[in-house]
Amino acid sequence: MIIHRVTKLFNLGFTDPTDSIMNMMESFNTEQKCREYLEDLLWYKDPICTNCLSERPDHYKLKKNGEFNGIYKCKDCRINFNVKIGTMFENSAIPLRKWFYAIYIFTSHKKGISSHQLARDIGVTQKTAWFMLSRIRHSLRSEKVKSFDGDTQVDETYIGGKNHKKSWQKRVENTQGRSTKTKAVVFGLLSNGKVSTEIVPNTKGKTLTTIIKNMVKRGSIVVSDGWRGYSQVHKHYEHKSIPHTRGQYVKDNYHTNSIEGFWSLLKRGILGIYHSVSPKHLQLYCDEFSFRYNTKDFDEGNRFNFALYCAFEERITYENLIA
């Protein structure tokens, strides 16, 4: 987990200048300060060549007009490198201080921030702000929870496709309930305060049971509502089925209140901040709210550093994002 490396960094005496938005803006008011912070966060001590992974303090520092701007030349393979290569900051014309501000606001706001608002805040176009936020969301996927044990709540929800918000000409018949004609299905698992979500094509037993078997360790207890898609779970786990349609919401102290509470946070965030999300990008937004939920016990500074470290894990281009 990335958080272990970040925690280790601060335990070694690394100063955290990110406990408030004002402190963060004052601490990172130049490109050099942002770059040096990234180098400390990623490299700890000595520069690491992105080509041959050579780690040494005497890599050449290349200067332009007598000034060093973070470009190194590897002393072993002779390839130029810098701390931004392989991260979401690579080849970006946006200054790092604007990236830092965007990441801080994105992670500290409980419901996120819209691209329109971010564009106004940092002085970029809405298209650029949307791409920045999408890159941030994509980078957070590297810390997505991949396995669960213990008591694991599972549930599914439907997002989008509300007919009452459409004109009569665009309304689709028979979209109520579990219809997927105009709605996307999101499946979620929650255990020990951590949640993971996945867009699924349907809520059939084969679909849901396969995900549960892949993500929940054997010997765990799986808790669900009475939906028939969970009817085969008992063959693989101890299964607590709580039939909500019969007015039952707790069974032997087991419930699905936590995962249902997460659905409320997700839907309120999408409706209140983003208003609507296309099915194509819905997974990124689900991952955003999963990250925010999974780091709910972090303060703003630790959450910012955690998200910043995720920037080193994955990078997506604009072409791939809109493809």
Model-derived features with residue positions:
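Residue-level recognition of single "structural anchor" positions
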Residues: 1-323
